[in-house]
């Protein structure tokens, strides 16, 4: 196949393709080989025994015990106050410092459970790994990212729980959300180190400008080599006397030029965006809660009215500054609790359900399923139910925390599954997505149970995210292909690309020798 309009480009394309050959070959091998390490870690690394947090089944009557515990222990300020399941049953969890261990209180006798954050982390570690009897070698509170727990995991602080196992199994757990934040062992940590060394060049992190410049130039070489090579293929007629290496190189070019251009182009875009663009995303806690004892009424409804079960319970402030309890109900209780969400707005297909299919268990960690849906609110001061809902709450929080006015709000959506704009690294479900017609084109994600701003996505970040998700990670295949199948196909393409590059170098060496 020939395209005559490309003839004027033939000479410069040939010149630059030859000049860039060695750099392109080295660059492709570095990133293709290291890229193969990513699915390798997924296939051969340690596996979770449980994909979701321990199920919370809490009696609603616990809400009346919260003010008594706080008053007895003279707690009048906290970042987060919530009731969570634990090894000892339902306990009150109080977060007073963002990076310090959380405090826990027994709701049956109001006593503080000393150093329980560590015990809670151990319990979660055993839940997720299924290692009920294996000894735990160490438990460490980690407040910074490192090579074994890189920044892409997002959650801090976490507990690093190391088991006394032959493979050095280690799990990172986030006690506020009861989430697993990462699972590794000696083998995976080593492979991950190779990946970060070869793929992201983290060894140059202390010289960021040099890293961006070198990686960017090599990626640009790959882009130019791909484009000039394809120009040659489309403008030169194959000779009947060509060697088999040249014929294979020519034919393989048709198959891999587009994926190769997608990998290198999206990688370059990702690198430059991370280095240059303003970063607006990231978890942000709500303003600290402060209160006086008389703001917490111990008379919460009647025991009869609280005779139902909850998925979660937390203390937050409404937009007027009044303390309220948020009681998260199982979905089948929505009609019985006196309040049902009627404000969920969705458009088109639910992008978070992947066309309604139940995700295979191995993909469950990436899709997520929210088990806490509707909620009702009780005034902490009066003990009576208030007419309020999650949508009103998160809209007010976005205005208070980010200064995003109601006039710019274009739509709201309850997110119950991980997807394109809100991925599994955030760990929290459900959250509310708020879309704003702001200068930055904000998509804001807020956890209604705690008031935490989980993520903020601007137009610039969204466009780069589309590029990286579709062209670099091939997530466009998710609606019709399982993750493992996708990874196998991507690995075959990378292997073919290395063969293609190797043949190109063989041709260059032979041409020079002749």
Annotate each language-model stretch with its function.
Residues 2-514:
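Conserved histidines in hydrophobic membrane contexts and catalytic metal-binding motifs
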């Amino acid at each position: 196949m020939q395209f005559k309009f490309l003839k004027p480009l033939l000479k410069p394309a040939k010149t630059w393709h030859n000049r860039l050959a060695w750099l392109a070959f080295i660059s492709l091998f570095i990133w293709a080989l290291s890229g193969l390490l990513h699915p390798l870690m997924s296939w051969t690394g340690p596996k979770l025994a449980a994909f979701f947090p321990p199920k919370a089944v809490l009696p609603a009557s616990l809400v009346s015990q919260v003010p008594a515990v706080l008053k007895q222990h003279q707690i009048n300020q906290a970042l987060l106050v919530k009731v969570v399941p634990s090894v000892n049953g339902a306990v009150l969890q109080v977060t007073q410092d963002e990076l310090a261990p959380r405090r826990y209180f027994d709701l049956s006798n109001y006593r503080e459970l000393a150093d329980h954050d560590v015990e809670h982390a151990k319990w979660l570690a055993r839940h997720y790994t299924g290692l009920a009897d294996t000894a735990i070698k160490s438990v460490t509170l980690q407040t910074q990212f490192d090579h074994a727990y890189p920044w892409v995991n997002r959650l801090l602080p976490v507990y690093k729980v190391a088991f006394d196992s032959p493979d050095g199994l280690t799990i990172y757990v986030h006690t506020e959300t009861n989430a697993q934040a990462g699972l590794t062992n000696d083998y995976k940590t080593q492979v991950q180190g190779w990946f970060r060394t070869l793929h992201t060049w983290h060894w140059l992190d202390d010289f960021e400008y040099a890293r961006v410049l070198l990686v960017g130039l090599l990626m640009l070489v790959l882009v130019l080599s791909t484009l000039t090579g394809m120009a040659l293929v489309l403008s030169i007629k194959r000779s009947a006397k060509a060697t088999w290496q040249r014929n294979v190189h020519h034919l393989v070019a048709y198959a891999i030029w587009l994926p190769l251009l997608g990998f290198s182009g999206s990688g370059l875009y990702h690198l430059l965006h991370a280095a240059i663009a303003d970063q607006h995303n990231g978890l942000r806690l709500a303003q600290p809660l402060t209160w006086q004892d008389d703001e917490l009424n111990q008379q919460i409804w009647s025991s009869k009215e609280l005779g139902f079960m909850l998925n979660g319970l937390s203390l937050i402030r409404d937009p007027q500054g009044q303390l309220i309890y948020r009681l998260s109900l199982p979905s089948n209780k929505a009609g019985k609790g006196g309040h049902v969400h009627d404000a969920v707005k969705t458009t088109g297909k639910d992008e978070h359900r992947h066309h309604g299919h139940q995700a295979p268990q191995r993909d469950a960690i990436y899709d997520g399923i929210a088990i806490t849906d509707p909620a009702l609110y009780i005034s902490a001061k009066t003990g009576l139910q208030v007419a309020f809902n999650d949508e009103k709450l998160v809209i007010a929080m976005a205005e208070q925390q980010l200064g995003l006015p109601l006039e710019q709000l274009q739509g709201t959506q309850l997110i119950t599954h991980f997807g394109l704009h809100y991925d599994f690294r955030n760990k929290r479900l459900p959250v509310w997505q708020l879309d704003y017609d702001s200068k930055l084109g904000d998509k804001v994600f807020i956890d209604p149970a705690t008031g935490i701003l989980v993520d903020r996505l601007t137009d610039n970040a969204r466009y780069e995210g589309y590029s990286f998700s579709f062209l670099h990670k091939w997530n466009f295949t998710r609606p019709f292909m399982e993750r493992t199948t996708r990874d196998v196909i991507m690995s075959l393409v990378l292997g073919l690309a290395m063969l293609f590059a190797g043949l190109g170098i063989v041709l260059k060496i032979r041409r020079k020798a002749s």
